[in-house]
Amino acid sequence: MVKYFLGQSVLRSSWDQVFAAFWQRYPNPYSKHVLTEDIVHREVTSDQKLLSRRLLTKTNRMPRWAERLFPANVAHSVYILEDSIVDPQNQTMTTFTWNINHARLMVVEERCVYRVNSDNSGWTEIRREAWVSSSLFGVSRAVQEFGLARFKSNVTKTMKGFEYILAKLQGEAPPKTLVETAKEAKEKAKETALAATEKAKDLASKAATKKQQQQQQFV
């Protein structure tokens, strides 16, 4: 059995902008699991299509139950090959990605097609398909379930990373990460607490002064 995923996403940016952002996605605050990226091949075909192959290195933290099945020295990084075909005339970009190590444990294959959104020519739609398989006897189903859940989580990070880079390229303020938002909220709460403490001290001081004045009136 192979786990299959199909998803549709929309980026509110033109195809040209998304195409430019695609090659500048890393690094971004949502791609900390992406360690390296290298272009290993690139060519322009006779029909003016751009073909590229990239090698990416990503962290591959295993679930705890899987760590018990493998030696401690098993690499925690996964190598990904990404082939892409860019057709500027028809404004489409198709990417194929798959892992080239840990293949016995799990293989994740992904196909994405980027094209102009049918409802808004200024937007870009992404059709994403993925196939997750495992050849491990006895635990392949659990591995595939884990792989599919991890893939969905990474898709969310990918889209947030895209939006972050697109905002930077378009001169807008990039959307804040949850860490940045939490940090700001913490700082604001600290400032509010400090202001409340100072106000309480001021009120207490005024109350003490007033009480002292009242006592002096009766002396």
From Swiss-Prot:
Leader peptide range in chain numbering: none
Protein name (Swiss-Prot/TrEMBL): PRELI domain-containing protein 1, mitochondrial
Broad class of the protein's primary localization: mitochondrion
InterPro entries per the UniProt record, alphabetical: PRELI/MSF1_dom, Slowmo/Ups
Functional summary from the UniProt entry: Involved in the modulation of the mitochondrial apoptotic pathway by ensuring the accumulation of cardiolipin (CL) in mitochondrial membranes. In vitro, the TRIAP1:PRELID1 complex mediates the transfer of phosphatidic acid (PA) between liposomes and probably functions as a PA transporter across the mitochondrion intermembrane space to provide PA for CL synthesis in the inner membrane. Regulates the mitochondrial apoptotic pathway in primary Th cells. Regulates Th cell differentiation by down-regulating STAT6 thereby reducing IL-4-induced Th2 cell number.
Annotated GO MF terms: phosphatidic acid transfer activity
Biological processes per GO annotation: apoptotic process; negative regulation of apoptotic process; negative regulation of mitochondrial membrane potential; negative regulation of release of cytochrome c from mitochondria; phospholipid transport; positive regulation of cellular respiration; positive regulation of endopeptidase activity; positive regulation of phospholipid transport
Name of the coding gene: PRELID1
